[in-house]
């Protein structure tokens, strides 16, 4: 069995080498004090039954050091979303129904929201987002100014978890970031065509020139379509990590909501990662199973060193925790038991593949969307 021990050790070593390459570029926001005597930008928040989340976002917006306008686009909410938004001084606009069924997801609400914006700079922010610092909006604007106030800037918020089950989002969040390609030196450095969806910043001129969310009207996950639309007009598209400025808490409704949400994401957003980066990601993830397999076999067969296999497992675990700490705050127990996270990720991936290729339909927030119709 020593030969098997050597093979598994080599596999995990190769896996960790891939792990060192998939997220070895950092793209972080930089803070800078800015002075505005007028509204710095308009924040548009698409919201559907978000009464339990939107208050945290609006409270954090009130704390910002620069003045902003806030528009909440109420997309058919049946709860107290509108009342909560008004209590924080936000302007609430009811989304006009999409009678023809031409729009998917939140794009319809976002596109309508721009017509109510009174500033040239516009930011689209999901209701489950929170600004962690009082200079968060300044950091966003500063970074946008550094790219000439042109194109599209997007941010993947730092993922904060409070309940144990929320930690099962860990691998998905890491894959969301590294799957953007630009965070790895394996990327060929060509123009980025993808954007994160939770926080995006642009200007009206570029937004209308590219078609804005109209270009994503058939996409549940609008970031890729938006990024492609801007790139086609030779406009810059940039992506950044949220920490320490922007965070979110996902799927507070329960474990079922978490499963449905990530099934939706994988159904529509797995095709943008470049092949060599995807290969490195797959090999890195496989290291989770290889490391636990080696440890379990060493406990059964004396020919395999328990100490060696435990060292291999702990080495992989250390890297696993290190990479995930960049994108979120997750349970230490789940981080150590990463094979469970890998198996859950695999389960959702298979479920997503079935919905996409067998049924062609995905459900989210009480609405069904046909994947086959996405352009």
From Swiss-Prot:
GO cellular component term, pick one: plasma membrane
- In which domain of life is the source organism classified? Bacteria
Key word Cell membrane present? yes
Its localization reads: Cell membrane
Membrane spanning segments where? 3-23, 164-184, 277-297, 330-350
UniProt EC number: 2.4.1.-
Q: What Gene Ontology terms describe what this protein does at the molecular function level?
A: glycosyltransferase activity
| Membrane-related topology note | Multi-pass membrane protein
Under the heading Pfam families, the entry gives:
Glycos_transf_2
- Pathway membership of this protein? Carotenoid biosynthesis; staphyloxanthin biosynthesis; staphyloxanthin from farnesyl diphosphate: step 4/5
Entry keywords, A to Z? Carotenoid biosynthesis, Cell membrane, Glycosyltransferase, Membrane, Transferase, Transmembrane, Transmembrane helix
InterPro entries, per the entry: Glyco_trans_2-like, Nucleotide-diphossugar_trans
One GO biological process term: carotenoid biosynthetic process
Statement: the UniProt record of this protein carries the keyword Transmembrane: yes
Q: What class of enzyme is it?
A: transferase
The cross-references to PANTHER family, in alphabetical order and at most eight, read: GLYCOSYLTRANSFERASE, GLYCOSYLTRANSFERASE 2-LIKE DOMAIN-CONTAINING PROTEIN
**What functional role does this protein have?**
Catalyzes the glycosylation of 4,4'-diaponeurosporenoate, i.e. the esterification of glucose at the C1'' position with the carboxyl group of 4,4'-diaponeurosporenic acid, to form glycosyl-4,4'-diaponeurosporenoate. This is a step in the biosynthesis of staphyloxanthin, an orange pigment present in most staphylococci strains.
UniProt similarity note: Belongs to the glycosyltransferase 2 family. CrtQ subfamily.
What is the protein's name according to its record? 4,4'-diaponeurosporenoate glycosyltransferase
Q: What is the lineage of its organism?
A: Bacteria, Bacillati, Bacillota, Bacilli, Bacillales
The gene name reads crtQ
